[in-house]
Swiss-Prot record:
Pfam families: Flavodoxin_1
Homology family: Belongs to the flavodoxin family.
Domain Flavodoxin-like positions: 3-145
Gene3D superfamilies: 3.40.50.360
Protein name per its UniProtKB record: Cindoxin
Domain of life from the UniProt record: Bacteria
GO molecular function term, any single one: flavin adenine dinucleotide binding
Binding site for FMN: 9-13, 89-120
Keywords: Electron transport, Flavoprotein, FMN, Transport
Role of this protein: Involved in the degradation of cineol (eucalyptol). The FMN protein, cindoxin, shuttles electrons between the FAD-containing cindoxin reductase (CinB) and 1,8-cineole 2-endo-monooxygenase (CinA).
Organism of provenance: Citrobacter braakii
One Gene Ontology cellular component: cytosol
InterPro entries, per the entry: Flavdoxin-like, Flavodoxin/NO_synth, Flavoprotein-like_sf
Cofactor(s) required, per the database record: FMN
Amino acid sequence: MNALILYGTETGNAEACATTISQVLADTVDTKVHDLADMTPRAMLDSGADLIVFATATYGEGEFAGGGAAFFETLRETKPDLSGLRFAVFGLGDSYYTTFNQAGATAATILASLGGTQVGDTARHDTSSGDDPEETAEEWAREILTALATPAVS
């Protein structure tokens, strides 16, 4: 199995979390980490990855950080068939704002609406909690490994 881990960041936290997620998954899964600013939906689909993990921070008024805005706008416009695509979302945000973790929720909604199948729950790291985002990412990645090992119930 192989996973493509994509991140959108302004301050570097999502990138650090993507690296942590990659390290946890690498015990079982071949991983590659890329900035969403350097990725297109077509390249994502052509990667052949069995799992796509998004680590995305909410920025400004609920927008995607970094290259996430352009990436997800292209997904909305082109509407590729994502059936057969498994994805997971690690969101970062600050509950001080009313748009807390909106980018992560929006990512999951877009991917599912195009036919993707979500693995595990969308993570919602809260900067205001004082919890280390990389520790939260590590715990969440272990949950994703467990979800991947559990057969789907139909």
